UniProtKB/Swiss-Prot annotation:
This is GTPase Obg. It is found in: Cytoplasm. It comes from Carboxydothermus hydrogenoformans (strain ATCC BAA-161 / DSM 6008 / Z-2901). GTP binds at residues 165-172, 190-194, 212-215, 282-285, 310-312. An essential GTPase which binds GTP, GDP and possibly (p)ppGpp with moderate affinity, with high nucleotide exchange rates and a fairly low GTP hydrolysis rate. Plays a role in control of the cell cycle, stress response, ribosome biogenesis and in those bacteria that undergo differentiation, in morphogenesis control.
């Protein structure tokens, strides 16, 4: 079964907690703090794999979590970093943030790695917080939480030649004739509901990839007949091979079919018409085929190359395949990379902003959110340090400028506090 979309949840590992420890050694009564740092959490990394051609695996497993870093230990021993979690995806996968719809990455090469969730920083041990005025700190930092998000994966096939045409035009028969692909073939429309890939051997060491795109109908550019899902794959092909039914079956007119297909490609993405386009006039073994072929040639008037074929009998396939190979050989290997957009707006490392949202004063800033997340709010010394840091950063002043009053809720990251007053500052909810 072919799956070309998937939704998965990724969670990077939290950083390990810093350690609270004091040196204990014979004849050294005041050894001082020696708590080590926690290790960094593992990141979640997507890796392009040319051996995969479907997102089927993500139908059965949707949640992925990297291990956290180890906690720090006494004697200044640091925790081990968590191992990164590597998830293999097909080449041609576009990765989007589910919450924003923005593009994180476009995986276009085998072995390409993309970090989609970064592991949290390890917390610092109490040895870091010793000073001449505070020689025995009894607190350490917690590990920073790892990033987490839902991702939308969208597979766009990477193929040299893409077959486009109406349902039942003979595309599946064609690809089964020229490659080892074995798509479902039957005498009714929409037999092919998922793309099929086949490798076409031209000569010794020479081959190209052909994609059988499910049939298009009028209105496909607007999503009619699952058109958006099918046309998405055409974008990644280097050459378009339009397969037209010359038999005139059920009153079909190859000239009309040609014009409708051309229009659908243009309306979906005008850039598709800049690709080389070759026409395969199929089913030339039928009664009215030659007459319809002459009409098509007159209509096109040499604008596109036409190759009369019969996918059923194999007639005319060899010249068509060699011509496709000639065209492919002259085309440069274009970069198919989609320019990633910023998934999260860059926040200043030092600064922060205060916004009032639904009656709650929300503080946003990379450093201040990390500071709160890595503070052990059950430890009085750690909370005192947090309060002093807030004062140095000017948090209370900014909250007052935003209109905060005693008793109002203040949210920083995932934590909420009650604003008390100028002297007491913030009190955890």
């Amino acid at each position: 079964m072919f799956y070309d979309t998937a939704k998965i949840y990724v969670k990077a590992g939290d950083g390990g907690n810093g350690c609270v420890s004091f040196r204990r050694e014979k004849y050294v009564p005041n050894g001082g703090p020696d708590g080590g740092d926690g290790g960094r959490g593992g990141s979640v990394i997507l890796v392009g794999d040319e051996g995969l051609n479907t997102l089927l695996d993500f139908r059965y497993k949707r949640h992925y979590k990297a291990p956290r870093g180890e906690h720090g230990k006494g004697s200044n021993r640091h925790g081990k970093a968590g191992e990164n979690l590597y998830i293999r995806v097909p080449v041609g996968t576009v990765v989007k943030d589910e919450a924003t719809g923005e593009i994180l990455a476009d995986i276009t090469e085998h072995g390409q790695e993309v970090v989609v969730a970064r592991g949290g920083r390890g917390g610092r041990g109490n040895a870091h917080f010793a000073s001449p005025t505070h020689q025995a700190p009894k607190f350490a930092e917690l590990g920073e939480p790892g990033e987490e998000r839902w991702l939308l994966l969208e597979l766009k096939l990477l193929a040299d030649v893409g077959l486009v045409g109406y349902p039942n035009a003979g595309k599946s028969t064609l690809i089964s004739r020229v490659s080892a692909a074995r798509p479902k073939i039957a005498d009714y429309p929409f037999t092919t509901l998922t793309p099929n890939l086949g490798v076409v051997e031209v000569g010794e060491g020479q081959s190209f990839v052909m994609a059988d795109i499910p049939g298009l109908i009028e209105g496909a550019h607007a999503g009619v007949g699952l058109g958006h899902q099918f046309l998405r794959h055409v974008e990644r092909t280097r050459v378009l091979l339009m397969v037209l039914d010359m038999s005139g079956f059920e009153g079909r007119d190859p000239v009309d079919d040609f014009e409708v297909l051309l229009k659908e490609l243009k309306l979906y993405n005008e850039q598709l018409l800049t690709k080389p386009l070759v026409i395969a006039a199929n089913k030339m073994d039928t009664a009215n085929a030659q007459e319809n072929l002459e009409k098509l040639k007159q209509h096109i008037a040499g604008k596109y190359e036409i190759y009369p074929i019969s996918a059923l009998t194999g007639e005319g396939l060899k010249p068509l395949i060699y011509r496709l190979w000639e065209i492919i050989s002259t085309l440069p290997r274009e970069s198919l990379e989609v320019k990633p957009q910023k998934v999260i707006k860059e926040q200043p490392e030092e600064g922060f902003v205060v916004e009032k949202v639904d009656g709650i004063f929300v503080v946003k800033g990379k450093k201040i959110e990390r500071l709160v997340a890595m503070t052990n709010l059950d430890n009085e010394e750690a909370v005192d340090r947090l309060q002093r840091t807030f004062t140095r950063m000017g948090l209370e002043e900014q909250l007052k400028r935003a209109g905060v009053k005693p008793g109002d809720l203040v949210r920083i990251g995932k934590f909420e506090f009650y604003f008390v007053d100028e002297t007491e500052g913030l009190e955890e909810e």
